[in-house]
Amino acid sequence: MLSSFFLTQHLEAGTDEAGRGCLAGPVTAAAVILPENFESKILNDSKQLSEKTREQLKPIIEALAISFSVTHLDPLIIDEINILNASLKAMQECVLQLNPTPLYIIADGNRPLLSKNSFKKCSGKIFTNREIEILQSIPSSSIIKGDSKYLSIAAASVLAKTYRDEYMNTIHEEFPMYNWKKNKGYPTKEHREAIRKYGVTKYHRMTFRLLPEQTVLDL
């Protein structure tokens, strides 16, 4: 069973991202503050849950959370500052959107979420000095496999995954030949064959190796 809290029982937020390894679409992050009495026998790392279970959990998390937020960062930003920095920035933006501001943050992963070097500038997504001050004033811990250890991170994992899946289902209608409704932008054989046949779209990440034999995709 997942633990409720890491250090404190008051306003501790969990945050996680989805879509880091995809060839197309945004990286999506979520942050969640759960109440002390939140319980769930089925909540776990979103990767361990079926799509049906994730969809069942989404409205429950949204209804019972003290606060939650979701952020998408598009491929242009991913290409500009790289996927690691984009993932951190998406989680940072989610933390800023929480109301009330959490007293502690736990993030899935092994990289410091709020270190001085993590606030990468990029086009259209520059934190103000005040926002950076707010983020740096909140103590945080990054926890490897945190989404399978703590309820708040698992809840964030579910929201990030379900919101990103909805986004990919929407853009699938614009470019159905890539079958994003099924592969969600991940590097499946089918997705790469579609890239080879039809080329790339505005939703593809140009700094990723979109085709295995290419170091840089020919445009």
Curated annotation (Swiss-Prot):
<dbReference type="GO" id="GO:0003723">
    <property type="term" value="F:RNA binding"/>
</dbReference>
<feature type="domain" description="RNase H type-2">
    <location>
        <begin position="10"/>
        <end position="219"/>
    </location>
</feature>
<feature type="binding site">
    <location>
        <position position="16"/>
    </location>
    <ligand>
        <name>a divalent metal cation</name>
    </ligand>
</feature>
<dbReference type="Pfam" id="PF01351">
    <property type="entry name" value="RNase_HII"/>
</dbReference>
<keyword id="KW-0540">Nuclease</keyword>
<dbReference type="InterPro" id="IPR024567">
    <property type="entry name" value="RNase_HII/HIII_dom"/>
</dbReference>
<dbReference type="GO" id="GO:0043137">
    <property type="term" value="P:DNA replication, removal of RNA primer"/>
</dbReference>
<dbReference type="GO" id="GO:0006298">
    <property type="term" value="P:mismatch repair"/>
</dbReference>
<keyword id="KW-0479">Metal-binding</keyword>
<dbReference type="GO" id="GO:0032299">
    <property type="term" value="C:ribonuclease H2 complex"/>
</dbReference>
<dbReference type="InterPro" id="IPR001352">
    <property type="entry name" value="RNase_HII/HIII"/>
</dbReference>
<keyword id="KW-0464">Manganese</keyword>
<dbReference type="GO" id="GO:0005737">
    <property type="term" value="C:cytoplasm"/>
</dbReference>
<keyword id="KW-0255">Endonuclease</keyword>
<protein>
    <recommendedName>
        <fullName>Ribonuclease HII</fullName>
        <ecNumber>3.1.26.4</ecNumber>
    </recommendedName>
</protein>
<dbReference type="InterPro" id="IPR022898">
    <property type="entry name" value="RNase_HII"/>
</dbReference>
<dbReference type="InterPro" id="IPR012337">
    <property type="entry name" value="RNaseH-like_sf"/>
</dbReference>
<dbReference type="GO" id="GO:0004523">
    <property type="term" value="F:RNA-DNA hybrid ribonuclease activity"/>
</dbReference>
<dbReference type="GO" id="GO:0030145">
    <property type="term" value="F:manganese ion binding"/>
</dbReference>
<dbReference type="InterPro" id="IPR036397">
    <property type="entry name" value="RNaseH_sf"/>
</dbReference>
<feature type="binding site">
    <location>
        <position position="108"/>
    </location>
    <ligand>
        <name>a divalent metal cation</name>
    </ligand>
</feature>
<keyword id="KW-0378">Hydrolase</keyword>
<keyword id="KW-0963">Cytoplasm</keyword>
<comment type="function">
    <text>Endonuclease that specifically degrades the RNA of RNA-DNA hybrids.</text>
</comment>
<comment type="similarity">
    <text>Belongs to the RNase HII family.</text>
</comment>
<feature type="binding site">
    <location>
        <position position="17"/>
    </location>
    <ligand>
        <name>a divalent metal cation</name>
    </ligand>
</feature>
